[in-house]
Amino acid sequence: MSSQITNKIKSDKLIQQIKTFAKNTKVLLVGGVIRDFCLGKENHDKDIIVVEKDAKIFAQELAKELDATYIPLDEINHIYRLVLRDKINFIDITNPIENSLQKDLERRDLRMNAIAYDLQDDKFIDLFSGFKDLNDEKINIISEQNLVDDPLRLLRIFRFQAITGFDIDENLIKIVKQHKNLINKPAKERINYELMKLFSGNYTVKALENLDKSGILCEILPIFNDVKKVPPNSHHHLPLIGHSIE
């Protein structure tokens, strides 16, 4: 799989422009772009980590090179976005957490989202068996603590299932259930965004069934507490909650 993804990276015009511009600066692709390439999906939002150079300066310089719009998304966490002229492609640029690539990757949500690719050395960095999960079509988290630190990830697990159709282990559903009360901590806008992504997937029913098992569904949409009380009737073999999900 990795050789096929390498070929996609090397044939991607924008990625190669970034590589050429970076020259001797260590720059890594990370997260969604690699996952999407593995899944054969288009990607218009590329995340890159800049090592040993200030991400803000790099982002400003790259914006000039690409004639892109520079947006400081989060100055505190040093996250900067470039919007390309086509208004379709985006580049998010940051430095690694605590100046450590390993610490940055280990704080991400899913193992399949924690694969990095070193543009200068042309090699993958897969510390958490992300490629294995992609091959096995499994969704696994890096750590339980990461869910507690950012509770939106409790919902993102199922958003990615809706998009990929990958399986979620029962133990992971139990872990999510233990922390379900945290899901309302993130801003409503962030929750709504994840729900929109979930409902746009090809495997929404599968994801909703597990979202219900985890208890998250009733936490974010309390109306389903009443829906679950309605039993099957002569017109449908499932309770109302099952019928609603179908």
Predicted regions and their residues:
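Catalytic cores of the polymerase beta-like nucleotidyltransferase superfamily
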Residues: M1-E246
